[in-house]
């Protein structure tokens, strides 16, 4: 049922309730019955109102139905209504109401499922990897989730900025530099004098080789960095290694089909004095104290749910990692992004309350729930029934590029989106490569490709299909498919509201299933010209909405398989 139809039906039900219970304030909710035989849409409004009104719920439901069906507008939407169980009202739509989705999709095309621009803007920060190695499968899940959430925001009318925050300051960058230095001097990772916390993947050898060859590299938003070849200068090695890995990560993201609007460097917060300014402000506001030679933030007093106070400045003088995060999010707010979303691994859950506490301590008018967070569990990769743990190039983990090379980016994107972010996910390489109904990407894309082939072989023109009479679409499998297509805008809205693109992934699988069921139940290219065109129009409508849904996930809609 289209959203506009739902709004109209709710208004009509409220008018019917007002006739039965003039004093009642009806909060009408509609839902799709779990069993198709029970109708197209249902409400429990009679059960909600019966007890306070001291009425029998079934009798009240019948009164509401009688008052509803007395309205001419209701009869245009509702074919019949029946009372079920303790007082549910199940509705069956008229054929015209069921078929209205076909014209809605035809008139809106790519815009079907999208909302008007709302004048609001949002910053979504994701991936945000340390420039210390290739992107891994956890970053791939962030990339898939983050880009899909950005696409959902865009579909919901927001102006979206994708941002990548580079943690290019701190001990990990120092470890990267000394690792490259050691490999450049011929020290192997298993040698006793190799850095204890050094990185051991083959990519370290590649960086050392290019550094010695005095090559130049450039990240997508940076100036070229030319290697000096001086292994005694850790500063030179550090600058080249960071630029090298930023470029490598850029290439990984390009292979994924993902482009960021902005890159933000952690080091810039130190260089600009924003980190020190943040600390000074928190001290001046009285939200800190000294203990054991360290500076502590009174996070337990700042109303964000932290269970203990947190160290900001360690006794040796260095800042803990959440301090620049507070400074960074203050900068986000000052840039006018009063709605921001961070997508991070669930191992970062402890930082949520700390960062929000720091922002509250700045007393800058920032809401307590800023920023919003989507925390995801990690990914286990399986192949041939065994877990794949190591990539030779990375040294200790499976890379994002590995996944793309193995199964293609469409499969990577869909598979990493199809489950709730807060659930662990097993990426089955064999399943992603299979050409079977069990592979959801293949199943959905095959539905789209099958429609393209069917229309191409039909001999019908686009104009003929567009003018087909949808009143001929009366088979149960056609009604089921029409109902599914009508749900799409509401699924998009729900996914955007909950920052949960898996809703779209589920819907795509269900829609493909409904299409295949219809295709197997009813011949499309029948001898009767009018019926053939009507069914081709339903197929074309399905193709359009499948393509719209796949686009929200960043997955292609192929014309042939």
UniProtKB/Swiss-Prot annotation:
Keywords: Aminoacyl-tRNA synthetase, ATP-binding, Cytoplasm, Ligase, Nucleotide-binding, Protein biosynthesis. It catalyses: tRNA(Arg) + L-arginine + ATP = L-arginyl-tRNA(Arg) + AMP + diphosphate. It is found in: Cytoplasm. GO terms for cellular component: cytoplasm. NCBIfam families: argS. This is Arginine--tRNA ligase. Belongs to the class-I aminoacyl-tRNA synthetase family. Pfam families: Arg_tRNA_synt_N (PF03485), DALR_1 (PF05746), tRNA-synt_1d (PF00750). GO terms for molecular function: arginine-tRNA ligase activity; ATP binding. GO terms for biological process: arginyl-tRNA aminoacylation. A motif ('HIGH' region) lies at residues 129-139.
């Amino acid at each position: 049922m289209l959203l506009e139809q739902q709004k109209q039906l709710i208004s009509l039900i409220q008018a019917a309730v007002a006739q039965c219970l003039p004093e009642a304030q009806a909060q009408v909710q509609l839902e799709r019955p779990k069993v198709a035989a029970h109708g197209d849409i249902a409400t429990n409004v009679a059960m909600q109102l019966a007890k306070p009104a001291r009425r029998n719920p079934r009798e009240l439901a019948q009164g509401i139905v009688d008052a509803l069906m007395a309205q001419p507008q209701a009869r245009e939407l509702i074919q019949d209504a029946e009372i079920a169980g303790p007082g549910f009202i199940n509705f069956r739509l008229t054929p015209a109401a069921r078929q209205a989705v076909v014209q809605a999709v035809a008139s809106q095309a790519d815009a079907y499922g999208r909302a008007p621009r709302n004048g609001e803007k949002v910053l979504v920060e994701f991936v945000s990897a340390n420039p210390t190695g290739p992107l891994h499968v956890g970053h791939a899940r962030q990339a898939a989730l983050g880009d899909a959430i950005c696409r959902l925001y865009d579909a919901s009318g927001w102006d979206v900025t994708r941002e990548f925050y580079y943690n290019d300051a701190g001990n990990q960058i120092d470890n990267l530099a000394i690792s490259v230095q050691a490999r450049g001097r011929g020290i192997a990772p298993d040698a006793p004098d190799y850095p204890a916390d050094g990185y051991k993947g083959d990519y370290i050898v590649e960086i050392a080789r290019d550094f010695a060859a005095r090559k130049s590299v450039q990240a997508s938003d940076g100036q070229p960095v030319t290697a000096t070849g001086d292994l005694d200068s850790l500063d030179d090695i550090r600058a080249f290694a960071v630029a090298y890995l930023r470029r490598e990560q850029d290439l990984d993201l390009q292979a994924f089909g993902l482009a960021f609007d902005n890159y933000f460097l952690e080091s810039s917060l130190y260089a600009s004095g924003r980190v020190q300014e943040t600390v000074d402000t928190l001290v001046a506001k009285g939200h800190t104290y000294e203990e054991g030679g360290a500076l502590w933030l009174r996070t337990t007093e700042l109303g964000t749910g932290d269970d203990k106070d947190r160290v900001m400045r360690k006794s040796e003088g260095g800042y803990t990692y959440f301090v620049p995060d507070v400074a960074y999010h203050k900068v986000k707010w000052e840039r006018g992004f009063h709605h921001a979303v961070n997508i991070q691994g669930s191992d970062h859950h402890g930082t949520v309350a700390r960062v929000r506490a720091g922002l509250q301590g700045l007393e800058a008018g920032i809401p307590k729930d800023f920023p919003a967070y989507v925390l995801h569990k990690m990914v286990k990769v399986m192949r041939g029934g065994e877990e794949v743990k190591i990539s030779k190039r990375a040294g200790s983990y499976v890379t994002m590029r590995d996944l793309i090379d193995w199964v293609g980016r469409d499969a990577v994107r869909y598979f990493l989106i199809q489950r709730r972010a807060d659930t662990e996910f097993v990426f089955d390489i064999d399943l992603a490569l299979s050409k079977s109904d069990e592979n959801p990407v293949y199943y959905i894309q095959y539905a789209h490709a099958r429609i393209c082939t069917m229309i191409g072989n039909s001999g019908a023109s686009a104009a003929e299909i567009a003018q087909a009479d949808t009143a001929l679409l009366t088979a149960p499998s056609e009604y089921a498919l029409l109902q599914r297509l009508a749900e799409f805008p509401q699924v998009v809205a729900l996914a955007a509201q909950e920052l949960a693109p898996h809703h779209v992934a589920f819907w795509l699988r269900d829609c493909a299933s409904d299409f295949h069921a219809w295709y197997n139940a009813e011949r499309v290219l029948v001898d009767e010209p009018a019926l053939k065109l009507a069914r081709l129009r339903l197929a074309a409508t399905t193709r359009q909405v499948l393509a719209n849904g796949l686009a929200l996930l960043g997955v292609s809609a192929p014309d042939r398989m």
